[in-house]
């Protein structure tokens, strides 16, 4: 969506306020300056008028932004051109607040308990005060309202996290401190069992050794292998840790956690492939059945749409009618376009015709699902080769990315799956699902070391917001239970 540019500059530190109690007046921002009109975005007939104290929504029906508002519900300030007290109070609160997404959202939602006219007007006023383009603001509010209605969410407590996630994506603020903190918390919770498997054993190792010696390395090898890091990656990792300890000139076990964290950060620093393409960007989703590929496609589509992209999903797994139906349901839920043929159709034909549709209808992103039948390895490889060939013929450079979806709970099987698909069609990125609650999180280290393929997203739950960009530093800290070293 690309709005809030002034606020993004403030958050990213391009402009620092001289006095922390008085935020900088960002260019073009009425919140950090002074509102000239005090009017919310959108005054068209289809938009509900602002309300100071509207009646709550009916228990069984959520008032959406599309619902009409009775004439007698329009407050005095809308009739006489004044500014309602809540607008003045909200503007002042936002100006004085710390420029963080969760803090600002807290002020916007202050006194709002459920979805309805009050929420829509406060969001519109918030956007208007930031001089957000009216059409973009209205699209955001409308789509969020429709999502609430579809999910049958009514109370703020049920959807606040989703609202913050949508704002973070729309603002490109996932690296903002609040969002990093939320992700770190999810990672820490999700890796609890893996951390217990590795962390507690490392604690015992450190407590039982006065210095880092051969016995120390032998015990560490056993710990890592038991944590699903695997024999070969463990051997490589210990070799690199030995060298790191030697360069640091230390044999003090107290330094070991920090050395391991630093090494893991290096391992996870594989550069992501960036392909400059003319739209649509074409992404091939691959992986065995049952790893969460369908929901991953839905979550990728959902993220892309919240970032302002038009998304088409193609059902390339034609060997299971249920797979086509399930993907269509998810496409409808997230509001993405959908293309499929009947069960048993040629997957390459589906990809080719979906490419036609994506080009002719102006889609920005095409996500192509594929089958994952490991018991027919030869046929699978041939099928993937054919899909890549027809996509490239139709749209030069396509597919621009091949994303492998792996289930973290499968442990060492993830390595054989990565090897198979990398040989079949090449893997550019990996999405690791079901990382929450597994004791086999060490497989992340194994995959990164053995193949050097960047892990771009991790699944930390069932909600749309629970698939987040992978950050190697955060993962290492959450895995080992160590804090980030403060900058010098």
Curated annotation (Swiss-Prot):
<dbReference type="GO" id="GO:0003924">
    <property type="term" value="F:GTPase activity"/>
</dbReference>
<dbReference type="InterPro" id="IPR004390">
    <property type="entry name" value="SR_rcpt_FtsY"/>
</dbReference>
<feature type="region of interest" description="Disordered">
    <location>
        <begin position="14"/>
        <end position="82"/>
    </location>
</feature>
<keyword id="KW-0675">Receptor</keyword>
<keyword id="KW-0963">Cytoplasm</keyword>
<dbReference type="GO" id="GO:0005047">
    <property type="term" value="F:signal recognition particle binding"/>
</dbReference>
<dbReference type="InterPro" id="IPR000897">
    <property type="entry name" value="SRP54_GTPase_dom"/>
</dbReference>
<keyword id="KW-0378">Hydrolase</keyword>
<keyword id="KW-0997">Cell inner membrane</keyword>
<dbReference type="InterPro" id="IPR027417">
    <property type="entry name" value="P-loop_NTPase"/>
</dbReference>
<keyword id="KW-1003">Cell membrane</keyword>
<feature type="binding site">
    <location>
        <begin position="369"/>
        <end position="373"/>
    </location>
    <ligand>
        <name>GTP</name>
    </ligand>
</feature>
<comment type="function">
    <text>Involved in targeting and insertion of nascent membrane proteins into the cytoplasmic membrane. Acts as a receptor for the complex formed by the signal recognition particle (SRP) and the ribosome-nascent chain (RNC). Interaction with SRP-RNC leads to the transfer of the RNC complex to the Sec translocase for insertion into the membrane, the hydrolysis of GTP by both Ffh and FtsY, and the dissociation of the SRP-FtsY complex into the individual components.</text>
</comment>
<dbReference type="Pfam" id="PF02881">
    <property type="entry name" value="SRP54_N"/>
</dbReference>
<dbReference type="InterPro" id="IPR036225">
    <property type="entry name" value="SRP/SRP_N"/>
</dbReference>
<protein>
    <recommendedName>
        <fullName>Signal recognition particle receptor FtsY</fullName>
        <ecNumber>3.6.5.4</ecNumber>
    </recommendedName>
</protein>
<dbReference type="Pfam" id="PF00448">
    <property type="entry name" value="SRP54"/>
</dbReference>
<dbReference type="InterPro" id="IPR042101">
    <property type="entry name" value="SRP54_N_sf"/>
</dbReference>
<comment type="similarity">
    <text>Belongs to the GTP-binding SRP family. FtsY subfamily.</text>
</comment>
<dbReference type="GO" id="GO:0005737">
    <property type="term" value="C:cytoplasm"/>
</dbReference>
<feature type="binding site">
    <location>
        <begin position="433"/>
        <end position="436"/>
    </location>
    <ligand>
        <name>GTP</name>
    </ligand>
</feature>
<dbReference type="GO" id="GO:0016887">
    <property type="term" value="F:ATP hydrolysis activity"/>
</dbReference>
<dbReference type="GO" id="GO:0005886">
    <property type="term" value="C:plasma membrane"/>
</dbReference>
<keyword id="KW-0547">Nucleotide-binding</keyword>
<dbReference type="GO" id="GO:0006614">
    <property type="term" value="P:SRP-dependent cotranslational protein targeting to membrane"/>
</dbReference>
<dbReference type="GO" id="GO:0005525">
    <property type="term" value="F:GTP binding"/>
</dbReference>
<feature type="compositionally biased region" description="Low complexity">
    <location>
        <begin position="32"/>
        <end position="67"/>
    </location>
</feature>
<dbReference type="InterPro" id="IPR003593">
    <property type="entry name" value="AAA+_ATPase"/>
</dbReference>
<dbReference type="InterPro" id="IPR013822">
    <property type="entry name" value="Signal_recog_particl_SRP54_hlx"/>
</dbReference>
<keyword id="KW-0342">GTP-binding</keyword>
<keyword id="KW-0472">Membrane</keyword>
<comment type="subunit">
    <text>Part of the signal recognition particle protein translocation system, which is composed of SRP and FtsY. SRP is a ribonucleoprotein composed of Ffh and a 4.5S RNA molecule.</text>
</comment>
<feature type="binding site">
    <location>
        <begin position="287"/>
        <end position="294"/>
    </location>
    <ligand>
        <name>GTP</name>
    </ligand>
</feature>
